[in-house]
Amino acid sequence: MSERSLPALDRDLPLSVAAALVAAFALLSGPVGFALTLLHPQPAWTDAATFVAHAHPIQQLPYWLGFGLLGSCLLLVARVVALSWEHNRTRALVVLLLTAMYAAAILVNYALQVAYVPVLARAGSPLVAYVTMANPEAPTWLLEMFGYGALGGATWAAAPLFGAHRPWIRRLLVANGVVSIAGAITCAGGMGWLQTVPGLFAYLAWNALFIAAAIAIAVDLRPRRTPRAAARTLLHTRA
């Protein structure tokens, strides 16, 4: 990176802060959000009428928190791309495009969950079966799984940008990519497994990998008292 760009980088968001936000929102929108919905749980999916009878606003909480996860992921990827653009432009662009695909799919899905599902539920419409993620066969699950599959592709592609001296970050990002893409591919054969015990274990495994990767980035790349030139070589390894 040129010396001329350094003052702007000094004022920019630290990579560690963006990663910490990702970890926090992944935890809140995932395990914590899921636990809170148990205060007013939905029974196992049977039909739209049963869903409407048990609908409650708290069931939307994980999706509202999911917007925070979406935004923090965009911040993290934007920072990674900015730091690696000069030396790894092609790989950085691939990461950026895959993340944009993730953001588009998840934004549409979560908007449907927090804005359209309540409207359909209040109206008692049977169309809610085609939108709510309480139904494991709803097409919105494809947006979810393929959206996070795209994000997994982005983390996989981004792994080499962290250099050979950060092997655990690289491994966690690659593992997250493998799990995310495998989940998306599996959905091509049917989505009924998503709300079974194997689906729950897959969900917990993804969250564990994703949160661990974000925490590793936040800890390893936290601001230190280093010379300016050294501090700007975080992502200089060519992929």
Residue ranges and their predicted role:
Residues 2-239:
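Hydrophobic, aromatic-enriched alpha-helical segments typical of multi-pass transmembrane helices
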